[in-house]
């Protein structure tokens, strides 16, 4: 995001992935090599979003099963994907301010309400104590758990660590471009605080509150979680079941999951639309609709084609498109360093 924002707003280049490679390949950024970079970014984004949409459909279907006893089948999950995609299409047609911003604000309010509820109703002191412990443990184990040297949990490493890295990387073109698009006029310091520090702290708080509450229930042998997680998509709702107003909070949880994936789909469609339009922000509406529809179709195809191993199909898709894009990210980091050093020399020379 910082690399894209720098080369777009400071150097006057189009808001697209290829612009970050200008220090390396100069005018060839607008040739076949630049096209290849953007194609890889589009593939990573669309499969990353489709993977997320598939997981979201599984969790939402699990919530519907939990609340209303609606069977958690592939057909239910496909129906959820169709509904999410339809709302996302309406949102992308309305644009950034009319659709994406409104849904994002709704999502943020619901998330704050649910988080505050879990902290207040749950064991607040235990949660905040766990916040300090888990933060320290995270920093202590960040490097050891980031590589495979000396590890005995190969299955976990490949099924979780590698998968989530690949999944996050596949999101990077979409998230990076979207953040760059809304960050015009910010300083690098403001950017780092808003994009790195604040989300990290909020994520740690969220994971500590929900994960800590679930672990407390397991240790106290309370509820279904104490018997082990038989279905990952039900874990959130099984934890909320042991708190007051379980029906209301579970319903909010389902809505939160759905709205989150709607905002991901519509904002991702806008980003893909911008990439394929050469950085233009006002591409034709039918093009936006096409990309939003493609995300839903790919997510549905992965779930339907994966059958009983739908989760494995989603993971394979994320890893396949995410890992190659790692090279692009590393190159963008180097390009940003080169661009900032050039800017520093320019400022110093201008001062003289």
Predicted regions and their residues:
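Membrane-embedded translocation segments of transport machinery
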Residues: 29-189, 193, 198-251, 256-258, ...
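Hydrophobic alpha-helical segments of multi-pass membrane transport proteins
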Residues: 111-122, 202-212, 252-274, 291-295, ...
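Flexible loop linkers connecting adjacent transmembrane helices
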Residues: 6-32, 98, 217-241, 268-280, ...
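Alpha-helical transmembrane segments
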Residues: 96-99, 179-189, 267-286, 307-310, ...
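Extracellular/periplasmic helix-loop-helix junctions in multi-pass membrane proteins
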Residues: 303-320
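Loop-to-transmembrane-helix entry motif
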Residues: 106-107, 243, 279, 317-321
């Amino acid at each position: 995001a910082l690399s894209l924002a720098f080369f777009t707003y400071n150097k006057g280049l189009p808001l697209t992935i290829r612009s970050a490679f200008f220090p390396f390949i100069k005018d060839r950024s607008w040739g076949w090599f630049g096209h290849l970079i953007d194609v890889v970014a589009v593939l990573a984004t669309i499969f990353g979003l489709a993977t997320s949409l598939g997981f979201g459909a599984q969790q939402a279907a699990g919530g519907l099963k939990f609340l209303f006893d609606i069977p958690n089948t592939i057909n239910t999950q496909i129906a959820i994907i169709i509904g999410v995609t339809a709302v996302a299409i309406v949102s992308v047609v309305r644009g950034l301010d009319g659709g994406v911003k409104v849904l994002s604000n709704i999502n943020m309010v619901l998330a704050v309400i649910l988080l505050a509820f879990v902290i207040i109703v749950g064991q607040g002191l235990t949660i905040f104590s766990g916040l300090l412990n888990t933060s320290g443990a995270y920093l202590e184990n960040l490097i050891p758990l980031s590589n495979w040297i000396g590890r005995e949990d190969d299955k976990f490493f490949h099924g979780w660590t590698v998968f989530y890295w690949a999944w996050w990387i596949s999101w990077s073109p979409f998230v990076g471009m979207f953040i760059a698009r809304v960050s015009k006029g910010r300083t690098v310091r403001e950017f780092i605080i808003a994009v790195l520090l604040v989300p990290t702290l909020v994520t740690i708080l969220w994971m500590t509150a929900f994960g800590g509450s679930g672990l407390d229930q397991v240790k106290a042998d309370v509820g279904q979680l104490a018997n082990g997680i038989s279905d990952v998509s039900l874990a959130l709702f099984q934890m909320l079941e042991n708190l007051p107003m379980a029906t209301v909070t579970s319903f909010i949880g389902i809505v939160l999951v759905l709205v989150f994936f709607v905002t991901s789909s519509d904002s991702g469609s806008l980003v893909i639309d911008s990439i394929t339009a050469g950085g233009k922000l006002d591409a034709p509406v039918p093009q936006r609709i096409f990309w939003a529809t493609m995300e839903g179709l790919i997510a549905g195809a992965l779930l339907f084609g994966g059958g009983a191993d739908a989760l494995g199909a989603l993971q394979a898709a994320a890893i396949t498109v995410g890992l190659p894009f790692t090279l692009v990210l590393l190159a963008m980091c180097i390009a940003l360093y080169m661009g900032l050093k050039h800017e520093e020399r320019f400022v110093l020379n201008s001062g003289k």
